[in-house]
């Protein structure tokens, strides 16, 4: 689950991080009032969406009057912002953050943290190349990224934070200020189950003080059950409607841009299914893992999700029967197809527990369901059907 910038800043401020001042506005009048309250020579109006690349997409504007703040806010709120991180429809802008005047600054730094799967620990990344996408820095000048891995038994040590400060070229009081900031960030990361933390840029102001000009936080969705206050911050308007509906039925769904809908049990098998569809010249329309408890109701909902995407021209069902029997899955598929009147080609591959019985149920159903002998055969059949 992602947080908006204003939510991220509020959370980080509660852990003692120095954040750029800002006021949330839901309309032009509120934006104008926010500009007056901040009282600087200028302000920055930022569209609040769950996507990066806002600046290049016109979602971040510098304004030098209350009238301009109102005008920019009204031009953004109620629209969809399309960035390189969104699909063609973009993300809805429901509010803007009017931020205080902080520039010019001495320099811009970068500080971020993720859970490193290779070390299975929280790893901080810092760079002198702030204000630039960290992926670009990693690709072009990786030597400018400094990494610190935190031992979960002892937590982030002051010496580690100071070492990063030295690497960033900070001096005197800035070193302790940065150490406090980084320690607060680690505490926030652990206590709130962050999956991602990023401050870019971390500005060094003309007076030498540090300030978080932007804030990006991603929460591990698996931990939301123990984070009730964080869960309240969820903005469902920023999520894909089908993905949101899928979560209500415990279906793991990710919308893609192809023509072949996929229904699979198991994330690994689902990825392999998408790979072989691509290999055979097709394009998957989604990732959909129905999980181990694939009941009739879940299969029906899975079909509905897939077919709500009007670009879907065919469906490939790939089920490996383990605990869940293939005959039970076949019965659920037949019932689902009858209930929702599926009118696109459907290819079914069943393997494992009671696979032969499952195939028999499909073949005797009288429905236009095509059985496949193996994944390779299934992919070839669905690609051929869609391209016919």
Swiss-Prot record:
Cofactor: Mg(2+)
Recorded GO CC terms: cytosol; succinate-CoA ligase complex
Biological processes, Gene Ontology terms: succinyl-CoA metabolic process; tricarboxylic acid cycle
Binding site for ATP: 46, 53-55, 100, 103, 108
Domain ATP-grasp: 9-245
Pathway: Carbohydrate metabolism; tricarboxylic acid cycle; succinate from succinyl-CoA (ligase route): step 1/1
Alphabetical list of PROSITE patterns matching this protein: ATP_GRASP (PS50975), SUCCINYL_COA_LIG_3 (PS01217)
Keyword Ribosomal protein: no
Binding site for Mg(2+): 200, 214
Reaction(s) catalysed (UniProt annotation): succinate + ATP + CoA = succinyl-CoA + ADP + phosphate; GTP + succinate + CoA = succinyl-CoA + GDP + phosphate
UniProt: substrate binding residues: 265, 322-324
Function field: Succinyl-CoA synthetase functions in the citric acid cycle (TCA), coupling the hydrolysis of succinyl-CoA to the synthesis of either ATP or GTP and thus represents the only step of substrate-level phosphorylation in the TCA. The beta subunit provides nucleotide specificity of the enzyme and binds the substrate succinate, while the binding sites for coenzyme A and phosphate are found in the alpha subunit.
The protein's assembly and partners: Heterotetramer of two alpha and two beta subunits.
PANTHER family: SUCCINATE--COA LIGASE [GDP-FORMING] SUBUNIT BETA, MITOCHONDRIAL (PTHR11815:SF10), SUCCINYL-COA SYNTHETASE BETA CHAIN (PTHR11815)
Name of this chain's protein: Succinate--CoA ligase [ADP-forming] subunit beta
Species the sequence originates in: Neisseria gonorrhoeae (strain ATCC 700825 / FA 1090)
């Amino acid at each position: 689950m992602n947080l908006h910038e204003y939510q991220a800043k509020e959370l980080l401020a509660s852990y003692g991080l120095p954040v750029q001042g800002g006021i949330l506005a839901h309309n032009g009048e509120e934006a104008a009032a926010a500009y007056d309250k901040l009282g600087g020579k200028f302000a920055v109006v930022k569209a609040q969406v769950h996507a990066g690349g806002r600046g290049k997409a016109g979602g971040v504007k510098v304004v030098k009057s209350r009238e301009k703040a109102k005008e920019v806010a009204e031009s953004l709120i109620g629209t969809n912002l399309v960035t390189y991180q969104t699909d063609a429809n973009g993300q809805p802008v429901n509010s803007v953050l009017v931020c205080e005047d902080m520039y010019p600054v001495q320099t811009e730094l970068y500080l971020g943290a993720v859970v490193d799967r290779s070390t299975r620990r929280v790893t901080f990344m810092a760079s002198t190349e702030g204000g630039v996408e960290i992926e670009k820095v990693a690709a072009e000048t990786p030597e400018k990224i400094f990494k610190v891995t935190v031992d979960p038994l002892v937590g982030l040590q002051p010496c580690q934070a100071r070492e990063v400060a030295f690497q960033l070229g900070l001096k005197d009081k800035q070193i302790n200020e940065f150490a406090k900031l980084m320690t607060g960030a680690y505490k926030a990361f652990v206590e709130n189950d962050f999956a991602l933390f990023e401050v870019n840029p971390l500005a060094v102001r003309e007076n030498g003080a540090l300030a978080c000009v932007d804030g990006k936080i991603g929460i591990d969705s698996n931990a939301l059950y123990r984070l009730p206050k964080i869960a309240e911050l969820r903005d469902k308007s920023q999520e894909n409607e089908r993905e949101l509906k899928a979560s209500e039925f415990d279906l793991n769904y990710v919308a893609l841009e192809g023509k072949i809908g996929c229904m699979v049990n198991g994330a690994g098998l689902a990825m392999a299914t998408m790979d072989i569809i691509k290999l055979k010249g097709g394009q998957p329309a989604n990732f959909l893992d129905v999980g181990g408890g694939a009941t009739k109701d879940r299969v029906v909902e899975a079909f509905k999700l897939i077919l709500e995407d009007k670009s879907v021209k065919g469906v490939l069902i790939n089920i490996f029967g383990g605990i869940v029997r293939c005959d039970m899955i076949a019965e659920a598929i037949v019932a689902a197809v009858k209930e929702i009147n599926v009118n696109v080609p459907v290819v079914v591959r069943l393997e494992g527990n009671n696979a032969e019985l499952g195939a028999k149920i499909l073949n005797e159903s009288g429905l236009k369901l095509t059985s496949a002998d193996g994944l390779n055969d299934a992919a070839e059949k669905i690609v051929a059907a869609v391209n016919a």
